[in-house]
Amino acid sequence: MTTQKYKSLLVIIWALWAFHPCLAIDDVLRTAKRDAILAQITGAVRPKKQISLISFGAKGDGKKDCKPAFDKAMKRAAHMGGAHIVVPAGEYLLNGPIHFVSNVCLELQEGATLKFSSEPAFYLPLVKTSWEGTFLQNYSPFIYGYQLENVSIIGKGVIDGNAGTTFATWKSKQKIGQQLSREMNHKEVPVAERNFGEGYWLRPHLVQFFDCKNITIEDVFITNAPFWCIHLLKSENIICRGIRYDAKLVNNDGIDPEYTRNLLIENIEFNNGDDNVAIKCGRDNDCLLYTSRCV
């Protein structure tokens, strides 16, 4: 009986030794594949020309509406072919969204806070977006980019959605809009006819880049989002690194990649009221129509 046990043990040891080279080869292949993917993920190319938000009339006193200054800075950046927009320390009230243009790096320096208004009307008119996997028109995300290249949000500053008193209360009212959006999805209603917004209670995202390439979001602190914090929709070549969260309102997912490829997420401090990372590929018929390869 003892001899039989030793024979069994010898067989097991021999089997492990025999397959060890194969396991080592598999590890090498996996590492090579991983490294090949990582080599493709470069994030945004950052422009060298710098402009200060202050030069466009912004004031970091927490009282003056700085949306016009952001709009002017983005317009200037577009005219320049790209720019690095620097936001120095201070609290910047925004009565409405920031709409990015291509080739812009938005740097929130340490001590800088973007504090968005809690007034829903400021996030109209409607923009092309997606809500829980259905493409539609809805309130603008607070920071939004559509069909852009080379966009960055960096720095040790804060993005405060300030959504606790309004948008965070909408979940109990959203059923009418949620059901209608899904019906339109199932019936394949043209996306241009799926108009929501006021009266439908579908909360906007805090940050959304839609159909964009070459994105970097790095080091910023995110809090009080109205819905998902960072929504990366139909986008590619993205780096999310060093982001810090204290976002515990309803459905404050950290990072939601949807129909997205070549995304690196690393060194994140999650403290979220929902999923930290939720990989998505749309919903129902929209998913079947728009699914693309994700890596």
Where are these regions (language model features)?
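Extracellular "leader-to-stem" segments immediately downstream of a signal peptide or signal-anchor
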Residues: 2-13, 17-105, 109-218, 227, ...
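Internal metal/ion-chelating core segments
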Residues: 197, 202-288
